[in-house]
Each structure stands twice: as structure tokens, then as C-alpha cells.
Amino acid sequence: MRTTLRKLLPLAAAAGFLLAASTSASASSHMDAPLITLDDAANTTDVYAFVQEENGRKVLVTALGVYPFEEPGIGPNKFNFDDDVLYEIHVATGRDVAAGRATVSYQFKFDTKFKNQKTILQSYLNVVKDVDDAAQNLTQFYTVTKVDHRTGSQDVLGKGVVPPNNQGNATPFYNKDDSGENPAKDGVATEAELDRYTKQSIVTLDDGYVAFAGQRDDGFFADIQSIFDLLKLRNPGKDSQGGFNLHLMALAIPMDELGGDQQTAGVYATTSRRRFRILADGLKKTEPFGDWVQVGRQGNPLFNEGLVAIEDKDLYSRTQPSVDRELFRKYAEDRKSVV
């Protein structure tokens, strides 16, 4: 099972190849709605889902990207998963597919730790040789929980650790010839070619699930400049995401956990924040509280940005697919109405 994500991750780092290689995958936009563009850590970029067979056993490989356009030149400190965001990958099976209801949801929750807070060196204290070693000052851990909406049960599948962000000399094994002086390694196609940090961060969870969470090259391809320049498209187009990273959560789900592989399944993802957050003078940290409120949603590529009118974009981000027919059907049927 471990090889399943070992194949997903290098493909996800090779722009465009994942879509061509997979049986069913979707990539989508990065700036869907006004409010979510102000919240990078909760801003969903892409959702991928495809079936793959490993050693006679089929799995549903899913992935959710967040934090668009991570500029490597800014340094490693800014780009991380948010402890205060609930990241979820939802899978619908059986009658739930047509109803737009999640049958099972998989939650990623993060916890950030510092080994030394009495230093200005936030991410790295020295060269990181292994994930979560003494040199990786800022380390993020995560828990994956399976929520079965049919029974209401919640089962923790396991935990993982996020590898360090790529920062040249501090993380040399991300780069060509394992040297921080060289550019980042190109996307790869085999397990053997994966970098050291990624290999160490792929975890096998309970019941045969496999997970990864960490920084990846952005595999989405779009000539965004020409699109927004009044559709003055270029041939060939230019990769606007080239050179930028994002943060990716990937989960391989055994198909027998979903009732077998002879069925149709629907996949979408959401991000949520706590309802309340109080800011006060003199506090080192604010603690959000209250129920989870959905702030981002991603499923069919480009639907929200490309078809939904401005007045409904934030509403789309904060609703479930179960109400799509009622609220957003008009955009699927009459595209001219929003141009």
C-alpha cells in the first residue's frame, strides 16, 4: 500500500502529468471567491481523485491542495498548514452521490510545535538531515480521522509528520545532487527517485490507509495572465504556477473500505474554521471556539470561478453539494447569464 502514495506524490509534483495519467482527476482554480482569497491556509486549490491498483488491490487515491502561489523567495516561515483549520476530504457512495451527501469524510487536523522558542530561527536551526530531527525547529504533526456519516462514528486512523519546506541549504535533499546550492529536483515518476524527506513522511495508517501532508510543487497549469488580460490567449500558453508551491494532503483509501470498486463515487473537499475568534490587547495567542463553519469548498474544476456570479461565489464556498441543484443549477445550464 505504501507505494500508492509514492507514485502519487512525484506525479503531483510534475505539472500536468497527473491529469493525463489518472483515470479520473480534477484540477481547479486557486482564487475562487472573494472571501477565501483572504485566507491562504484555508484556500483550496485542487482536488484529485482516481482509482489505482496495487498488488491486486484497488485504492481510491485522493488529494487536496491549499495555500496557492507559495513564493519560495519569501522563505519557509510563512507557508504552513493552519492548526485552526479543519481540512476534510469527503467521499460519497451509493445514493449519496446523486444526493450530494458525503458518506464518509476524512479529517486532517494539524498541531504545530517548536523545539526551541528562544531563538529567532523559526523553521530551521541547522541543516535538516531527517524529518523532525533536532534541526527542524518548526514541526507540524497531523491526525487523520475517519467520520462515517451513516453511523456517526469517528475513528482516528493514525498520525503523521509534515516534512520541512524546501529552503535550499537548510533542506539539501530536495535539490539536485542533494545539494542546497542547486535548484530543486524535477518531478519524478518512480518511488526510487523520491527525495529523502518525502519518503520519510509517507505513513501507513490503520486499515491499510496511506497518507502524506506537506509542501509540493503546484501541478496546476494555466496561463492566468492571458486569461485575465481580456482572454488574449497565447499559443503556446505559459505556466503561471511554474516556480510556485502549495501544501498538499494526500490519502489513499482502500476501495473495500468504501464497499468495493464496482460503483461510482463522488469526491470533494472543504475547509472550515471555528465560528468565533476574540482578539484582545496583551494576549500572546488567540483561541478560536464554537462550531466549525465551512469557509471553502472544491470539487468540479473551475465551477465557482468560471461559472458562478460574484454575488453567489462566497455562498458556494460555504454550502454543501446537496443544495447545488437548488442554488447553482442556473449557472450550469446557462453560462451566458454571468458574462
Where are the model-predicted features located?
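Bacterial N-terminal signal peptides
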Residues: 10-20
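Surface-exposed extracytoplasmic segments
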Residues: 25-339
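Bacterial N-terminal signal peptides that target proteins for export
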Residues: 2-12
